[in-house]
């Protein structure tokens, strides 16, 4: 896999993703944010087309590439960015320029929950780049328990704040992971538990993580 920073917000990079495979694909063509990606080569792509294995991050998808909807007339596969496995957009926080705000994070549908931790790995990569760029903190707002749990693996913790869109805000210092506590982790999960319209997978996940401690950091972030 290759991690690549396509540019910061001032460079106005854009990326055209296959909207059939990536959530929020339209957010990557509008500009105004930085973009980073994980790419895979052809061999990895072939392996990735094998059935996904469910992990504790979110329900694995089993999308068959051959079953994708047909593209409309005038749109060709070649117009989409090739070999992208995950992508992220980001820009300075509107109220604090020392904080980098992650705007959108998306993983190709057949790779979600396959155990490779592509989303957390891409966030960790971006955090290292943000440190070199002089940011003090990095933040993200999430709307589901799976993403919330995954962000704890790269040193984010719940801030006890929500956005106007009912998303939970997590952040961490740039230089080191935030100190996670069981009580703080569970407070965020409790917010999701109180919501209506949860999927069966979300209900099961929240039940399984009742009284659980925060997940371990990715191995690359753990202190020796």
Language-model features and meaning:
Residues 150-151, 170-174:
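Short secondary-structure transition/capping segments
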Residues 1-84, 95-101, 131, 158-161, ...:
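Haloarchaeal acidic low-complexity proteome signature biased toward cell-envelope/secretome components but also
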Residues 107, 114-128, 153:
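Conserved acetyl-CoA-binding loop-helix of GNAT-fold acetyltransferases
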């Amino acid at each position: 896999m290759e991690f690549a920073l396509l540019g910061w917000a001032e460079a106005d990079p854009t990326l055209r993703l296959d909207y059939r495979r990536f959530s929020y694909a339209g957010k990557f063509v509008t500009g105004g944010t930085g973009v980073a990606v994980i790419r895979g080569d052809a061999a990895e792509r072939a392996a990735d087309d094998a059935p996904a294995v469910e992990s504790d991050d979110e329900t694995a998808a089993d999308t068959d590439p051959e079953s994708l909807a047909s593209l409309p007339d005038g749109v060709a596969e070649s117009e989409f960015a090739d070999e992208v496995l995950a992508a992220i957009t980001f820009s300075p926080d509107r109220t604090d320029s020392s904080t980098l705000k992650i705007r959108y994070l998306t993983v190709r549908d057949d790779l979600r929950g396959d155990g490779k931790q592509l989303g957390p790995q891409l966030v960790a990569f971006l955090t290292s780049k943000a440190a070199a760029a002089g940011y003090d903190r990095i933040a993200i707002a999430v709307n589901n328990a799976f993403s919330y749990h995954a962000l704890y693996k790269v040193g984010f913790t719940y801030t006890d704040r929500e956005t106007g869109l009912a998303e939970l805000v997590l952040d961490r210092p740039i230089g080191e992971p935030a100190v996670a506590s069981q009580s703080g982790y569970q407070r965020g999960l409790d917010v999701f538990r109180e919501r209506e319209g949860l999927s069966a997978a979300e209900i099961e996940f929240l039940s399984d993580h009742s009284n659980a401690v925060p997940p371990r950091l990715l191995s690359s972030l753990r202190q020796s």
